[in-house]
Structure formats: structure tokens, C-alpha cells
UniProtKB/Swiss-Prot annotation:
Keyword Transferase: yes
Protein name: Tyrosine-protein kinase SRK2
SMART domains: SH2, TyrKc
PANTHER family: TYROSINE-PROTEIN KINASE
InterPro entries hit by this protein: Kinase-like_dom_sf, Non-receptor_tyrosine_kinases, Prot_kinase_dom, Protein_kinase_ATP_BS, Ser-Thr/Tyr_kinase_cat_dom, SH2, SH2_dom_sf, Tyr_kinase_AS
Length: 362
């Protein structure tokens, strides 16, 4: 199968991705100023359709010739009904909890049904975790954030305890559980693709001046075909528990949090970028806890002295450099999520100079 997509890093260019056995190979399709498309200049085509048809007949340097186009992996996002598009408070009686999927510090997650027909995920928040009025105000914003790489908020139940958060259901659960379980056989290209998906969702939040505050593998959900979506964005700032205090709370995720946020409560999209660098280490180590062997206090002390986690075993230096860029001391020096997205999406893209040896890649 193959897929042609517009390049994130170079508008006007395109990328061609081809599945070859267990691997996916990527090639850059360039566009000429005077019109026309090519992978290598010895074969220039008037349209993308002409290019695809040519490589369907012969590989001419590609790893294989093009066969079937890739089918869309994701169903379009929908609301529960036309009523819930603008009215997100629904009756608790309309939700049926089927089975428990997991539990976190502040609640549990269930597979459920809305009106006995629509599969949903239901996050229940422990009593006292956050003020319902504050959450409802935040939900008004969250409901409007729509992107293929963000978990879609469908509705809420804030009348009574526990508060229910109703979202789309993802078949594989949290990225952390997935990495520690069946995803252990995934290779680097798939892991980097998952990181790129997370970066794409975060780039959308960045564009809308929205901060996640708790970006980590446990807050990414995975569906079929390794589709990843960012979940729980914005909820961390609403938590009122003393255990979630940056300086002394036992439940505060110090190891994922940028120093300026952990020490001075200075959260920003750039502190999310720091957390994203930590998330990449979770990916390439299949869910290992960051800074193994260190306490939270030791992590903060060492970071202040300039310490950064070493490059994980078998991780390419170029990927480790992306992590280091995320962990720069000055938040302003860290990359944007938009830049991270295209760096990761184009991590394995081949230029024409590498094109003849494509079969040797990956």
C-alpha cells in the first residue's frame, strides 16, 4: 500500500510513503516552480496522478512499485447527536458503564454506552478532585478544540458526583499501557510516527494558545493501526488536591515537568515541549519511567546543574538531539510543536540523493 501526503516541512512538496513488508519507506516528491512533480529529475510528471500511475507500472528506483492506495484509518469525528454539539451537559442516566479500562490518580476510565447504542469512554473524577463549575467552564473551551489527533470531548455529567467526562473510545487504551504490553514489538519508524502524531495534536493546541500541562504517555490514547490522540488536555490546572502541588505533592509528575513549571508554576506551551521530550523517551524505552533510580528531588537538583537524561540505547543521535532541543534551559530556545511535527514526520523521508538506495533504508 502507499500514501501521498502534503509535506509539513516544505509546503508545496509532498511525501510518498510505501509499505514494503513490515517497513514503511518514505520519499520526497518535489514540485517545480514552472509546474510538474518529481522524485528524481530524470522522471518529471505534469500531475501527481501521472507520477503515481508511472510508479504503479514500474518501481524505477523505489523499493517496490506502487500497488493499492492506503485506506483511511480513522473514522471522521462526530458528536453523540446534533443536540450535544452545543449542549455538552447530558443526563447521567443516558450513560451505561460496561467495563473498567483503567484507573489513575484522580479517577477511573470505563468503556461505556450512550443511550445504549453509541460506544464511548467515560472518565469518572473522584469527589473533590475539581470544582464542577470550573470544569464546566473549561469544557466549553475543550469542546471547541477539534483535531484528528485530539481526543474529542463529547459531553459531561457534572450534576452530582462523580463528574463524568464522555469522550470518543480508543481501542488500545493509554500509550503507556500499550508500550508496556503489545507494542513491545514496534520498531523505531512506528514509534517515531506515533511521536509525530502527538506533536501534530499539540501543534493544534499551540496554534490555539492552549496548554496541556500534563503531557505524558499515560495521557495519550491509542486506537487501531497505532493511531495516537492527545487526551486530558487542560485538566491538570483544575485539580484542587493538595497531593497535586508542584513543590510537595506526592502525585505531581515532576519527572515529566519542565523546571520552570515545577519550581515556579510557570506553565506554557514551552513547558509542554519539555514534557514532549520526556514522552519520546517513554516511546523508545517502551514505557520506562524517566530518570530511573532518581527521586523527584534528585531530578530537580540534577537538572539545575545541567544534567539531561543520556541517549537511550539504540536511539539515533538525530532523535536524541530532538529530545535535547526540547530540554533546553531557556523555554524560548525550545522548538515549537509545529517544528517538532515536521522534523518527526520527515525523519525518514528520502531526498533524491538517497533515492537510488531506498531498499537499504530502515
Amino acid at each position: 500500500t502507499f500514501l501521498v501526503r502534503e509535506s509539513e516541512s516544505k509546503p508545496g512538496d509532498y511525501s510518498l510513503s510505501i509499505q514494503d513488508g513490515d517497513n514503511v519507506k518514505h520519499y520526497r516528491i518535489r514540485k517545480l516552480d514552472e509546474g510538474g512533480f518529481f522524485i528524481t529529475r530524470r522522471a518529471v510528471f505534469n500531475t501527481l496522478k501521472d507520477l503515481v500511475q508511472y510508479y504503479q507500472n514500474e518501481s524505477d528506483g523505489l523499493c517496490v512499485n506502487l500497488r493499492q492506495p492506503c485506506r483511511p484509518l480513522e473514522r471522521p469525528q462526530i458528536d453523540l447527536s446534533h443536540k450535544t454539539k452545543d449542549m455538552w451537559e447530558i443526563s447521567r442516566d443516558s450513560i451505561t458503564l460496561i467495563r473498567k479500562l483503567g484507573a489513575g490518580q484522580f479517577g477511573e476510565v470505563y468503556q461505556g454506552l450512550w443511550n445504549n447504542s453509541t460506544p464511548v469512554a467515560v472518565k469518572t473524577l473522584k469527589a473533590g478532585t475539581m470544582q464542577p463549575a470550573a470544569f464546566l467552564a473549561e469544557a466549553q473551551i475543550m469542546k471547541k478544540l477539534r483535531h484528528p489527533k485530539l481526543i474529542q470531548l463529547y459531553a459531561v455529567c457534572t450534576q452530582g458526583e462523580p463528574v463524568y467526562i464522555i469522550t470518543e473510545l480508543m481501542s488500545k487504551g493509554s500509550l503507556l499501557d500499550y508500550l508496556q504490553g503489545e507494542a513491545g514489538a514496534l520498531k523505531l519508524p512506528q514509534l517515531i510516527d506515533m511521536a509525530a502524531q502527538v506533536a501534530a495534536g499539540m501543534a493544534y493546541l499551540e496554534l490555539h494558545n492552549y496548554i496541556h500541562r500534563d503531557l505524558a504517555a499515560r495521557n495519550i490514547l491509542v486506537g487501531d493501526n497505532n493511531i495516537c490522540k492527545v487526551a486530558d488536555f487542560g485538566l491538570a490546572r483544575l485539580i484542587v488536591s493538595d497531593d497535586y502541588n508542584a513543590t510537595e505533592g506526592a502525585k505531581f509528575p515532576i519527572k515529566w515537568t519542565a523546571p520552570e513549571a515545577a519550581l515556579f508554576n510557570r506553565f506554557s506551551i514551552k513547558s509542554d515541549v519539555w514534557s514532549f521530550g520526556i514522552l519520546i523517551t517513554e516511546l523508545v524505552t517502551y514505557g520506562r519511567i524517566p530518570y530511573p533510580g532518581m527521586s523527584n528531588a534528585e531530578v530537580l537538583q540534577n537538572l539545575d546543574k545541567g544534567y539531561r537524561m543520556p541517549c537511550p540505547v539504540t536511539t539515533p543521535e538525530s532523535l536524541y538531539q530532538i529530545m535535547l532541543d526540547c530540554w533546553k534551559r531557556n523555554p524560548a530556545d525550545r522548538p515549537t510543536f509545529e517544528a517538532l511535527q515536521w522534523r518527526l514526520e520527515d525523519f525518514f523521508v528520502l531526498d533524491a540523493g538517497q533515492y537510488q538506495h531506498a531498499a537499504d533504508v530502515l
